[in-house]
Amino acid sequence: RLASADYFSMHFGKWHLGGKVPPNGSNSSKAEILSCNQHNWNDPLIDGPQTIGFDKSRITVEGIQGAPYSFFRNGYLETTKNDIKLWEVGEYPMPQGTSMIREGFPGEGDISWDSTAYNMILVNETNDFLDDHLKNRKDDPFFAHIALGATHIPHR
């Protein structure tokens, strides 16, 4: 673990190494993963970055290409159930371009989901992490892993 070597660590971006939603009973369909009562939002994601020792994280479990279309900070859903909507397949005009939900991948997510802003959200989060680290731990080592969404579809 990085922590045993006194590294302060972060992972921002897509996380394809687990990140399963904690069950609260039986499983539901992936499309309704956020609003159903079959998940326990008081517990962090199972096998999220925090599980393997990252000090900070802000992730999406499927990147920009699959539900849930929401960020999770340090293992916990960032939005509330009141701010969840079903994203249907389609194209959604956004200030920075066209956000897309691909055929076969409708699903729930944050009402403010915008795949075109994804990378800049992660870049800004990384800058904040680095600024904080240099201000508060400038003599300590750090590890920063950023998994941007630009290498994946959908693109527009």
Feature roles, as predicted:
Residues 1-156:
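Formylglycine-dependent sulfatase
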